[in-house]
Every structure is written in C-alpha cells, then in structure tokens.
C-alpha cells in the first residue's frame, strides 16, 4: 500500500479511543473475575482462555495487562492480582522453571519491572534483576548474541530470533538500575548482531538466524513461524519495528532511527486493504489465509514509541500511522463484551503450519496474550503520557 493511499484511512478519534479503553478495562475485570490470581494459556480456544501454570513464555503479558488496568483505573483489585503474580515470578526464577529461553524480558518486564516502577516494591526489583542475570547467561561471546531457546551447549540451538529485540529492555533497565554496564553492553552487542543478519536488503526480516557454534560466524536465515525462510512473517516484522524503537530509546544510535523508518515503512507498504495484516506478508488481498491482529497492535506501539524521539514531521506521520492501525483494530478485531470473549483482541495467529516451517497449527483466529496486551498498551499510549514497562 502506497503511503498516500494509507494516509486516506481515518485515524482513531478521541471519543472512540476512550470508549475502547472503557471496554478494554471491562474485559480485564471480567477476566480477573474468571481467573483470580491464576494465569492464562498462551491463546484462547473458541475465544475463551483456559487456566495455565506460570511456565509459558507469555505469562508476563496477562500480568502486564493488569498493571495497565491499574494505572488507568486506580482500582486496587488489578494491583493486588498483579502483585500476587510477582510472587509466582520470583518462585519461577529461583526454581528456574522454563527459563532456558531469551523470553525473560517478555516475562519479567511487564510483570516485575512494572511492579517496581508503579509501586516501588523492592522484591519485584530483585526478581527482575535476577531475571536479567539469567538472560545474560544466554549471551555467546563468539557469535555476540543471546541464544533464543534451549540448552546453551546444544549446537542445534545456536541461533537468535527477531523476537529477542523486545527482551533487551530488561537488560537496559538493569544497567540503569544498578549502574553496572555489563547488561547494557550485552544488549547493544546483541542488537548490532541481530539487525545486521536479520534485516534483509528490502527491509523485510528473517525470523531466525543460525550461527556456526565453533566460530560464531553467521550461517543462514530461516523461519520457525513464518511461511518460508524467504517470506516476511508479519509478527516478526513488527517485533523489528518495536524492538528497534526501544533500542533507540536506550542508545540514541542514529543508525537505528534510519533503520526503523525502513522497517516500519515495509510493514505499511504491505498492509492489505482493511489494514489487518495477513499472518505472513507473502499473502495479499483476496487470500483466504488468516489475519494476525497482534502484528498491528505491536507495530502501533513501536511507532508510538519511536515518535517520541523523531522530528515533528516524521513523528506526526508515525503517530498518525499508529492511530490508523489502532482504529482498524478497534473497528474489526476488538472484543465487544464478555459474551464474545474474555480476551481483548480477536483474529490473532500463534502458529500456522506450512511445508516450509517447523511450527504447528495452533491459536489460529483466536485471542492471544501478546495481542491483548499490546492492544491495551496502544490505547494507553494514545490516551496519556506513559512510562513504558519496557
């Protein structure tokens, strides 16, 4: 979609924004009544979530949604539930329950970092720093990157994925909080490596990239959840958008500003007519493939984050772009009430199997926890000056 065509779409207005916020916190309240201090599964089934243990990579997003609701409403029921979660996250860290992953930022930034920022709770701070230390353990000196998944001595897992750009703020925060540069240095090393190998010449993104475990040399880009190694997985593209924006906030590296614009513009240029992207950009208008609403939610948050640091003309464009994406989500994907779902955002995709990837079909045309969270974050960003959890 050409920029001039995109600019013809309406932006989310103030009235619709505040109506969406009110509805969103009603949804959060309904879900809290259902789940209490329990966690939700990664994605819904027939639009309703089931209970889950705190052993999944997505657990932090539900806690983060509770913190957003508390910030906006002041209702202590949201705070109390979120604080109960921080106790569970401490136990998870101490017992190392499913912590052999780079997703420690997804887990601990919207839960424990948020708790510390909003309440000053020292236990939450200590837990988040413990998670940052565990994330540092995943850094490979030879390759100069944080390994995504699995055992660190498994050569088959010697790779990074684009999602990790959203985990780096945990390290940036840890350096700012402790005064120890080791966290920041490793985050900066990872982002340099990741952007060098993951962003293609046309500014689309690989999902994952392998390195030689003996030498650390880059080997090849492939996909796990995209259509194919050469396609542009929609959610991967938006992890790039938001991840670059966050690293720019912490480093002010001018190269990231330039790269952000190219990566974000690729996303906009490949949007379909209704502005809800297909789960992979290989698909275009007329395809029967499912959309992934969560990709738009994350992209909107990334654009709003970066706009804080751009010259006015560019900032206005990306704020307007985010408002157009959020309006499309409000109009077409937002849950209308508890009878429809206990989530926030319909029409997400977790995994879609193809002959060219190694994931499975699950969470298709369902709510998912990151889609719910980033949709709510996008609304909050548009409604107030907000201090990010990231």
Language-model-detected regions and their locations in the chain:
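Glycan-recognition and catalytic cores of secretory/periplasmic carbohydrate-active enzymes
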Residues: 1-390
């Amino acid at each position: 979609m050409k920029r001039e065509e995109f600019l013809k779409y309406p932006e989310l207005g103030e009235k619709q924004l505040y109506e969406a916020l009110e509805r969103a916190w009603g949804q959060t309240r309904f879900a809290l009544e259902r789940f209490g201090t329990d966690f939700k599964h990664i994605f819904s089934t027939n639009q309703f979530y089931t209970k889950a243990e705190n052993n999944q990579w997505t657990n932090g997003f539900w806690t983060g949604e509770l913190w957003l609701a508390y910030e906006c409403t002041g209702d202590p029921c949201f705070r109390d539930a979120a604080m109960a979660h921080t106790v569970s996250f401490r136990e998870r860290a101490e017992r190392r329950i499913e912590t052999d992953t780079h997703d420690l930022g997804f887990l601990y930034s919207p839960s424990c970092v948020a708790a510390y920022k909003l309440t000053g709770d020292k236990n939450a701070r200590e837990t988040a720093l413990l998670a940052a230390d565990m994330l540092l353990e995943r850094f490979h000196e030879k390759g100069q990157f944080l390994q995504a998944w699995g055992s660190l001595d498994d050569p088959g897992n010697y790779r990074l994925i684009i999602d990790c750009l959203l985990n780096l703020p945990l390290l940036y925060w840890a350096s700012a909080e402790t005064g120890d540069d080791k966290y920041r240095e490793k985050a900066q090393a990872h982002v340099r490596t990741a952007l060098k190998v993951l962003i293609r010449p046309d500014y689309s993104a690989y999902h994952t990239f392998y390195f030689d475990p003996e030498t650390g040399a880059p080997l090849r880009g492939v996909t796990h959840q995209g259509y194919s190694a050469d396609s542009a997985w929609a959610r991967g593209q938006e992890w790039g958008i938001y991840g670059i924006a966050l690293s720019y906030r912490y480093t002010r590296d001018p190269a990231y500003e330039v790269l952000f614009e190219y990566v974000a513009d690729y996303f906009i240029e490949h949007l379909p007519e209704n502005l809800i992207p297909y789960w992979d950009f290989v698909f275009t208008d007329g395809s029967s493939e499912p959309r992934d609403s969560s990709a738009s939610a994350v992209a909107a948050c990334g654009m709003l984050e970066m706009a804080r640091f751009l010259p006015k003309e560019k900032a206005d464009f990306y704020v307007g772009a985010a408002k157009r994406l959020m309006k499309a989500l409000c109009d077409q994907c937002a849950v209308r009430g508890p009878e429809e779902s206990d989530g926030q955002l319909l029409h997400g995709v977790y995994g879609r199997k193809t002959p060219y990837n190694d994931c499975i079909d699950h969470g298709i045309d369902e709510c998912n926890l990151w889609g719910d969270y980033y949709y709510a974050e996008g609304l909050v960003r548009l409604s107030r000056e907000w201090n990010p959890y990231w």
